[in-house]
Amino acid sequence: MSFLTVNRLASKLLNSKNATYFLVAARNASASTTNLKDVLADLIPKEQNRIKNFKQQYGKTNIGQITVDMVYGGMRGMKGLVYETSVLDPDEGIRFRGYSIPECQKLLPKAAGGQEPLPEGLFWLLVTGQVPTEEQVNWVSKEWAKRAALPSHVVTMLDNFPTNLHPMSQFSAAVTALNSESSFARAYSEGVHKSKYWEFAYEDSMDLIAKLPCIAAKIYRNLYREGSSIGAIDSGLDWSHNFTNMLGYSDAQFTELMRLYLTIHSDHEGGNVSAHTSHLVGSALSDPYLAFSAAMNGLAGPLHGLANQEVLVWLTALQKELGGEVSDEKMRDYIWNTLKSGRVVPGYGHAVLRKTDPRYSCQREFAMKHLPNDPMFKLVAQLYKIVPDVLLEQGKAKNPWPNVDAHSGVLLQYYGMTEMNYYTVLFGVSRALGVLSQLVWSRALGFPLERPKSMSTDGLMSLVGAKSG
């Protein structure tokens, strides 16, 4: 539930101008301050007070029912988390602090000569609810550049991993090892007051986001570029540009793609595995390094972070079997054969969305602009015309439309990043922007240890009056 969702609910229940105070403050706050921590320090007390008043008046209000199917079905659709930074609308897709992806593409600052939003701007938006100025985004870029250096023990660790260790395992382990630098862990051990927790969560989150491209690039170079140096951070470049430089890519279009990729993969509400994991682990007052590392272990699971690889494998198999130019009729037959074999068409459908994922749409627009004649893009575009109709005809899919994973791998392949095992690391670098923004707010709002009630099957049967035999 985003702060906009909470605000609408509060406005409806309280019928008071005070309920919209935080939203108005966020939208109209002075743009003169470039220090993100100072902006947060101003916003937090207001939001604390707003939620306190809301809970006092409506804390016992019922907001939904829980069914047996929900309990057995992965808690799908169950309202059980407060998550401020983004909300997923089944029809409109993700909204970052109330802004759709097209709105973010239009409103967020861009690099000189660029057309895609800078992830630094999205991070500012996620943290504050405010669309940042160019000066504020530049401040974030320079701040991350200043914090980017890796401690020597993490570098040594990365350089000594076996080459058969999966990139995500290396990524998660390196993030965990950064825990040695945690301001939050140190402050907690020294007895800091809980009202100050957010300050140290903020410092750790800023440090971690700054260092992630260095970790990710080092993994890439070690595995796929014979251990060549990632080079030095350039404080005059934005976060994405430094990342692509360290990866070894100099194409300006690839840097633009990375800006788009890191923006649109950053957050997707709070119930997905990586976001929920970071929230859960963080609720134990584990520091941001430990919470994010746990989230990355969840992202590494095939049901969460490996979907774009599965899309590419399926597309490659399609090409191998049918050849280069594929007729619509042959493609329909191939799709039906996939479905009749008990498999799914990877990249299509979504647990929540009921229309084309706007993250797919903006990648499609990027491809139409920069690589309209690429054979793989043409194949993806052809599938977009055919797959939804086949899925509707089959009658099983609640959502026959493509999601973000149907397109991202094709774009990366076009610019030369063909190492599919690495793609989830890029996803992880991006997802840090969302889950760490929320982690700071979770500590600021004093969210408690997450501890839902579990039940046995016998207990559930007894609860609903069913026979256990």
Curated annotation (Swiss-Prot):
InterPro entries: Citrate_synth-like_lrg_a-sub, Citrate_synth-like_sm_a-sub, Citrate_synthase, Citrate_synthase_AS, Citrate_synthase_euk, Citrate_synthase_sf. One of its GO terms (molecular function) is citrate (Si)-synthase activity. PROSITE patterns: CITRATE_SYNTHASE (PS00480). It catalyses: oxaloacetate + acetyl-CoA + H2O = citrate + CoA + H(+). Its main location: mitochondrion. GO terms for cellular component: mitochondrial matrix. Keywords: Mitochondrion, Transferase, Transit peptide, Tricarboxylic acid cycle. One of its GO terms (biological process) is citrate metabolic process. Residues 1-30 form a transit peptide. Its EC number is 2.3.3.1. It is found in: Mitochondrion matrix. Oxaloacetate binds at R359, R431, R451. The active site is at H304, H350, D405. Citrate synthase is found in nearly all cells capable of oxidative metabolism. Belongs to the citrate synthase family. Key enzyme of the Krebs tricarboxylic acid cycle which catalyzes the synthesis of citrate from acetyl coenzyme A and oxaloacetate. This is Citrate synthase, mitochondrial. It comes from Tetraodon nigroviridis (Spotted green pufferfish). The gene is cs.
